[in-house]
Design a protein with these regions (language model features):
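N-terminal amphipathic alpha-helix/helix-capping segment at the start of soluble metabolic enzymes
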Residues: 1-31
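Hydrophobic faces of well-ordered beta-strands that scaffold small-molecule active sites
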Residues: 28-31, 49-51, 89-93, 121-123, ...
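Surface-exposed amphipathic alpha-helices with a cationic face
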Residues: 10, 15-22, 42, 78-82, ...
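Glycine-rich, proline-tolerant flexible connector loops at the mouths of alpha/beta enzymes
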Residues: 37-38, 44, 48-74, 93-100, ...
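Glycine-rich phosphate-binding "P-loop"
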Residues: 1-6, 88-99
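Non-catalytic helical/linker scaffolds that mediate oligomerization, partner binding
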Residues: 2-5, 65-68, 75-83
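Conserved anion-binding
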Residues: 86, 97-100, 104, 110-155
Length: 155
């Protein structure tokens, strides 16, 4: 997409987000599930695009986010990444893909990153997922922290 509203075309990275926070700058974030919307959101200068498990509701018409699969999230993640030049792209790991073991969490995280080329992942949960998140980070995968948020299990 030609031109960015903000005029800033530099790729947003996790390091850059930390710098923005330290300077007290506002950080913008919107959700996208597809190539075309991702181009529009990215072109508007949004800093972070979340490929949320809410695609289950918005794109597939499900009542909850629980039915969405890892492969469906990968599809949406790939579509969004292809449409983005500037924004940092975060992909949700869907419920049930990281809760049973740290090994499963890392395996699924690596799969999503290798196939989608996203910039970071997001897992929902609290203290019960800390060890899985630590292993994912140790594998070199950035995590967009949302500890304490458990929307998927409280629907």
């Amino acid at each position: 997409m030609a031109g960015y509203i903000s005029g800033d075309t530099r790729k947003v990275t996790t390091h850059r987000l930390v710098e923005m926070k330290q300077r007290g700058e506002k950080i913008s974030m919107l959700t996208s599930y597809d190539y075309t919307t991702a181009q529009i959101v990215d072109g508007a200068g949004i800093d972070v695009i979340l490929v949320g498990d809410s695609a289950s509701n918005v794109m597939a018409g499900n009542v909850t986010t629980l039915p969405i699969t890892l492969d469906q999230m990968i599809y949406h993640g790939k579509s969004v990444v292809r449409g983005v030049k500037r924004a940092l792209v975060v992909v949700d790991l869907p419920f049930g893909t990281y809760q049973t073991s740290e090994y499963e969490a890392v395996t699924n995280a690596i799969k999503v990153m290798k196939i989608t080329h996203a910039d970071a992942l997001k897992l929902e949960g609290g203290v019960e997922i800390i060890d899985a998140v630590k292993k994912i980070i140790a594998a070199g995968i950035p995590h967009h922290g949302t500890f304490g948020v458990n929307a998927a299990i409280y629907q």
